[in-house]
């Protein structure tokens, strides 16, 4: 199991190095912007699910002491 995780880490490091070496600065910034938008959209879409959890578990669990 340890050997497999080392191989995965090495492959991901190699692919990251290849990506950085082939991507221009503009492309990198566009990719970073896309990641930020996906994170924002994920947070927004998780809102209704969090509301359902709050309602189902009652007020004591989510209130601050």
UniProtKB/Swiss-Prot annotation:
The entry's keywords: Amidation, Antibiotic, Antimicrobial, Immunity, Innate immunity, Secreted, Signal
Species assigned in the record: Lonomia obliqua (Moth)
Function: Cecropins have lytic and antibacterial activity against several Gram-positive and Gram-negative bacteria.
Family: Belongs to the cecropin family.
One GO cellular component, as annotated: extracellular region
Record's keyword annotation contains Signal: yes
Pfam families for the chain: Cecropin
GO BP term, pick one: antibacterial humoral response
InterPro entries per UniProt: Cecropin
Protein name per UniProt: Defense protein 4
Signal peptide positions on this chain: 1-25
Localization per record: Secreted
Entry keyword Electron transport: no
């Amino acid at each position: 199991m340890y050997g497999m995780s080392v191989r995965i880490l090495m492959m991901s490091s190699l692919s990251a190095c290849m990506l950085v070496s082939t991507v221009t600065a503009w492309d990198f910034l566009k990719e970073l912007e896309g990641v930020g938008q996906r994170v924002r959209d994920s947070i927004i879409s998780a809102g209704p699910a969090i509301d359902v959890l709050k309602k189902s578990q009652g007020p004591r669990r989510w209130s601050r002491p």
